[in-house]
Curated annotation (Swiss-Prot):
Protein name from the UniProt record: Plasma membrane fusion protein PRM1
Subcellular location: Cell membrane
Membrane topology annotation: Multi-pass membrane protein
GO cellular component: mating projection tip; plasma membrane
């Protein structure tokens, strides 16, 4: 940099390749730290929380299964009840008709036989009485006629005697008394049992009619069953009463464990950030410190150039020095300590040294990144998640869910019993009232036939023993049905469900923790793989330089061998003409011969000509 002064040169020292390399290393470490921290912090977001929805999905499946089973149960029960209702109706009517028909036939036979006997006997009695009365009245009439003539004579004589003593000739005629007596006998003559009595007796011959009892009974029995079947037909799409099956809420395992997971993630990322900051600070300090020797070197160069240029200007002589070798290779200050050999020049040339420096820089970056990753590995060991809060929530959630299931089954049980058997219970009550009314009608019919007869008591007893007692039993059975007809839905096994849910939660707990741990391990493994790849690449670059070293050794050995051969051939011809070893030039001589330096900027020579005029050249 011959055109720049010392201050201008110092202003660009920070742009040296060493500082640039350290800055690149710092950037690489920073990017590595950022990506690693981001990966660690994102692990909780990628945790498998799908297990949280598992209980809800299971409860939905249970709900669908329970509702489908309940609907199938209700439909099957409705169909069964339709068949049962028709069967019971026909059986009841068959029993009633059998009992009523049997005893109607018996009643008819008893009534017909009794009425025929009574009618025939009564008719004979009436006819006999009428004949006897007529004969008796004729006999009495004959006697009365004779008595009437005697009495008339007595009356006539008495009347005449009375007239004699009284002298009254206007006395009543005796025929008046005779007429009166004859009239009385005439009424007795017409005396007989009326024929209407025979008509009433003949009415008993007519068969007793129980058809009204049958028709009314059949109508009464069919009415509740018809109403019941109509109601069932309306409930073909029997709903479940609008009661919803309880669903388990999401477990929120990740929400509960998120605090622990976030704390672990924060701790790991903090450790990584701290380690990266330390490394970055060290690299920044190194980047600053590496400029110190460079500044010093620039200062030495500047002083030397000032002295040389001043001496040259003072002599007013232009010397041309070759500075290419001194300034083209910036590693010259370090290489000067190495033996001045061809091999060192070859392997540390600009082409070869680039691969070596980049490879070593890569290894250094890998080493720094591995330090950060190693800190993460150490911190990641023994990462556990506190599941006590999860267990507590599980216990509370399970208790609430089981109570909700109990409430659901109880409501469904009441709903099904009401919709399926509510009408059955009302029908049983109606049948009870129907049977009661039937017995009342039957008793009224029997009483209308046998009332005020000697058969009333026995017939009522027979009716009760044969029909009434059975109807009482039927009424008792219907009452029992009304009190006990219900469906008891079997409840779920609470203990088994609770154990299963706890098993799911424990698996989800371990899943949450294991997923986080696996995420950390996968992240570490991924970055290890990346670091290994960077290590391989860096080693490959160093290997290229090593290969160049081997090539240089081969070339150096070859050249040395050729040189020895040439020297051997020259030795025989120059045995007598030996030249002594050259003497090293002094510094003044080196300046005169232009050894190692060249002045390429006349402007600088003129600039310092007046300043350095008259000065001597100092030894450097």
């Amino acid at each position: 940099m011959p055109y720049l002064n010392f201050a201008e040169r110092i202003s660009q020292v920070y742009l040296n390749k060493y500082t640039l390399a350290l800055v690149l290393v710092t950037i690489k470490v920073y990017l590595f730290q950022k990506t690693l921290v981001a990966a660690v912090r994102n692990i909780p977001d990628f945790s498998d929380c799908s297990v949280d929805e598992l209980p809800t999905k299971v409860s939905v499946m249970i709900r669908n299964m329970v509702e489908n089973n309940l609907n199938s149960f209700t439909y099957s029960t409705l169909a069964l009840l339709h068949v049962a209702a028709k069967s019971i109706l026909n059986l009841i009517w068959f029993a009633v008709e059998m009992l009523l028909g049997t005893y109607t036939c018996l009643f008819k036979a008893a009534i017909v036989g009794t009425s025929d006997f009574a009618a025939d006997t009564s008719e004979m009695v009436v006819k006999g009485l009428n004949t006897t009365i007529v004969e008796i009245t004729h006999d009495i009439q004959s006697g009365l006629d004779g008595l009437s003539s005697i009495l008339n004579k007595v009356v006539s004589t008495a009347s005449k005697v009375a007239d004699f003593f009284t002298g009254n000739n206007n006395s009543d005629s005796p025929d008046q008394y005779q007429k009166s007596i004859s009239l009385s006998l005439g009424k007795l003559t017409n005396l007989s049992i009326p024929s209407s009595v025979l008509g009433e007796i003949n009415k008993i011959r007519i068969d007793p009619d129980f058809s009204s009892v049958e028709n009314s009974t059949k109508k009464l029995i069919e009415e509740p069953f018809t109403s019941l079947t109509n109601q069932w037909n309306q409930n073909e799409t029997l709903s479940l009463g609008g009661v919803k099956f309880p669903l388990l809420q999401p477990l929120s395992v990740c929400d509960i464990g998120s605090k622990s997971i976030q704390e672990l993630s924060h701790n790991l990322s903090t450790s990584v950030e701290m380690a990266a900051k330390i490394v970055i600070i060290i690299l920044a300090i190194c980047a600053v410190l590496v400029m110190v020797p460079l500044i010093y070197d620039e200062w030495r160069k500047w002083n030397r150039e000032e002295r040389i240029i001043g001496n040259l200007v003072n002599q007013n002589t232009h010397y041309y020095f070759d500075l290419r070798e001194a300034f083209s290779n910036l590693l010259h200050p370090y290489l000067r300590f190495l033996p001045k050999s061809w091999l060192s020049t070859y392997v540390f040339s600009n082409y070869s040294i680039s691969f070596l420096l980049v490879g070593l820089l890569g290894l250094f970056v890998v080493f720094l990144q591995y330090i950060i990753l190693r800190i993460l590995i150490k911190k990641a060991k023994g990462t556990d998640i506190d599941t006590s809060q999860m267990t507590k929530e599980l216990s509370n959630m399970t208790s609430v869910y089981l109570s909700q299931i109990d409430s659901y089954f109880q409501k469904q049980e009441d709903n099904i019993n009401d919709k399926l058997f509510g009408s059955v219970k009302s029908t049983s009550s109606k049948i009870n009232s129907t049977l009661h009314e039937f017995m009342s009608t039957l008793n009224d019919t029997v009483n209308s036939i046998f009332s005020n007869t000697p058969f009333s008591g026995p017939v009522n007893t027979i009716v009760y023993c044969t029909i009434g007692r059975k109807i009482d039993k039927v009424e008792s059975g219907l009452t029992w049905i009304n009190d006990n007809l219900s469906v008891k839905i079997p409840n779920i096994n609470k203990k088994q469900l609770s154990d299963n849910l706890k098993s799911v939660i424990s698996e989800s707990d371990s899943s949450a923790g294991s997923v986080f741990a696996k995420g950390v391990q996968k992240t570490i493994a991924m970055y290890k793989s990346n670091l290994f790849l960077e290590f391989v690449i860096s080693i490959s670059l160093v290997g290229v330089w090593v290969m160049q070293l081997l090539i240089g050794v081969i070339i150096a050995v070859t050249k040395s061998h050729l040189k020895r051969r040439r020297l051997g051939s020259l030795t025989s011809s120059l045995d007598k003409t030996r030249i002594s070893s050259p003497k090293e030039l002094t510094k003044e001589e080196k300046l005169q011969y232009g050894y190692g330096f060249s002045v390429t900027n006349p402007y600088e020579v003129q600039r310092y000509s007046s300043k350095l005029s008259g000065t001597k050249i100092y030894n450097t």
